[in-house]
Regions:
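Transmembrane-helix motifs of polytopic, lipid-linked glycan transferases
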Residues: 259, 263-284, 322-326
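Short acidic/glycine- and proline-prone juxtamembrane loop motifs at membrane-interface regions
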Residues: 261, 301-315, 358-359
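Transmembrane-helix signature of polytopic, membrane-embedded enzymes
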Residues: 256, 276-299, 317-318, 334-341
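Transmembrane-lumen/periplasm boundary regions of multi-pass, lipid-linked membrane glycan transferases
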Residues: 61-66, 177-196, 210, 214-226, ...
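Extracytoplasmic catalytic/substrate-binding loops of multi-pass membrane glycan-assembly enzymes
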Residues: 70, 187-204, 210-222, 234-246, ...
Length: 444
């Protein structure tokens, strides 16, 4: 037969809203804030509110799908297989996506239930003669693999090479329509039956884009967040876990989908704009200059881009800005009690920032310059203030950092302790020190 393999040119706008809608909503927002301004004569509310809401609308536009396949098949032994039966034998495309399985089921083993590497997909029309269609490589987690061709098979056999393999969903397409599929044979069944690979067919995409799957470093951070949300033994050796726990909280509350795991970044991106406004106001004491700072922040491409991906940068940057905000407040304060409160809050946000990513340690150096400049200028209660700073900027961040590990199963057969947190951070340092790997999103 003639087989028409179409690249299915995909419209990047997938039904959430359109740029024209954004302009419409932004106009409504401006009108509403103008009416508030006319009534209350509050310039700050009008300017800042307009900037923040318009930026928020743009930031959340086409953020991600509200659903994606979740239930995952995993074998109980090596070299396990099952057979699917198709409603028609002709098809042109296979889409497959894998997620993480039940790591906790691997009793006593420091391994992870993860990946399609080595899985063989075969086709047959008589259940006796089998043709090899494809042998899958690992590929990134929660990113689709597509196999295109001209196929004619009634039965599909999936052969896993390792008990650590997983498949979340598989779908077969013919001329843009999905082919009906059912399980023909599944000898092992059990807790994770073969039916799990075809139970969410309405959620699988024929032409996936960023909107439908993991993108960039979401393969690390969102994977870890889902492990935390599901109470799974986790693979975490790249960064501290506060930011990951924030994403995990949203997944726990609202379910697992691209929109949900990217939403915390959008919220913190909006908070960054507000924080920039107020730190500018504290520095310049001018509403208009503060608005300029906030607008410049909204126009920064890195700020917008990283806020729309399930990464850690929005959390880290927000906490860094806040630790500087309270240090600037300390610098401009004359009341000693209020000075200490501002130093305490600066230290708390410093602890939060370092608990997201280690690069906040570099940012914290600037706090010391501001602190010592004021101490040298004022020359009052220097020793007493420095002693308080040992508590605020050393002990306090260490305690926050360690407590951020409490919700997480980093240790399979052990529990949280300061010793275990320390050893885990040594492992993270070793990972970054020895890392020499490529990345499929890297610049060339």
């Amino acid at each position: 037969r003639r087989c028409y393999i179409d690249d299915h040119t995909t419209d990047i706008v997938k039904g959430v809203t359109t740029p024209l809608s954004n302009l419409y909503y932004s106009f409504i927002v401006l009108v509403c804030f103008y009416l508030i301004y006319r009534k209350h004569k509050n310039k700050e509310l009008f300017y800042l509110g307009s900037i923040v809401v318009i930026y928020g609308i743009i930031s959340i536009w086409n953020l991600g799908s509200f659903e994606m396949p979740i239930s995952t098949w995993q074998p109980t032994t090596d070299n396990q297989s099952f057979i699917l039966e198709l409603s028609q034998s002709e098809f042109e495309q296979i889409n497959i996506i894998y997620g993480e399985g039940d790591n906790n089921s691997l009793v006593g083993e420091y391994e992870y239930q993860l990946g399609v590497d080595g899985i063989i997909i075969e086709g047959s029309n008589d259940l006796s003669n089998w043709d090899n269609i494809v042998t899958l490589d690992e590929g990134p987690i929660y990113e689709y693999q597509s196999i295109k061709g001209c196929f004619n098979y009634k039965y599909i056999r999936i052969n896993s090479s390792s008990k650590l393999n997983t498949i979340t969903e598989i779908a077969f397409y013919n001329k843009d329509s999905i082919v009906g599929t059912k399980v023909y044979e599944d000898e092992h069944g059990g807790k994770y039956p073969a039916s799990l690979v075809i139970d969410e067919q309405e959620m699988i995409e024929i032409d996936p884009i960023y909107y439908d799957e993991f993108f960039f470093d979401e393969v690390y951070h969102v994977r870890n967040a889902k492990e935390i949300a599901d109470g799974q033994y986790m693979y975490a050796n790249t960064h501290p876990l506060l930011g990951t726990n924030i994403i995990a909280l949203f997944i726990k509350l609202f379910g697992f989908s691209p929109f949900v795991y990217r939403l915390p970044g959008v919220i913190f991106g909006v908070l960054i704009v507000i924080a920039i406004y107020y730190i500018c106001k504290k520095l310049f004491d001018d509403i208009y200059l503060s608005c300029v700072g906030a607008i410049l922040c909204t126009g920064d491409f890195m700020h917008l881009t990283t806020s729309r991906i399930g990464t850690l940068e929005p959390f880290s940057i927000f906490f860094i800005i806040m630790m500087y905000y309270f240090m600037v407040k300390y610098y401009k304060e004359d009341n000693y009690k209020k000075e200490l409160i501002n130093l305490l809050l600066s230290g708390i946000f410093m602890g939060f920032a370092i608990s997201v990513k280690w690069n906040a340690c570099y940012s914290a150096v600037g706090l010391a310059f501001i602190l010592f400049r004021k101490l040298l200028e004022k020359k009052e209660r220097v020793i007493k203030t420095l002693l308080w700073c040992l508590l605020f900027f050393v002990l306090n961040p260490i305690l926050i950092y360690c407590l951020c590990y409490l919700p997480d199963k980093v240790w399979k057969d052990d529990v949280w302790s300061f010793k275990n947190v320390f050893e885990h951070n040594l492992m993270m340092f070793k990972y970054h020190h020895e890392l020499n790997a490529s990345h499929h999103f890297e610049s060339r």
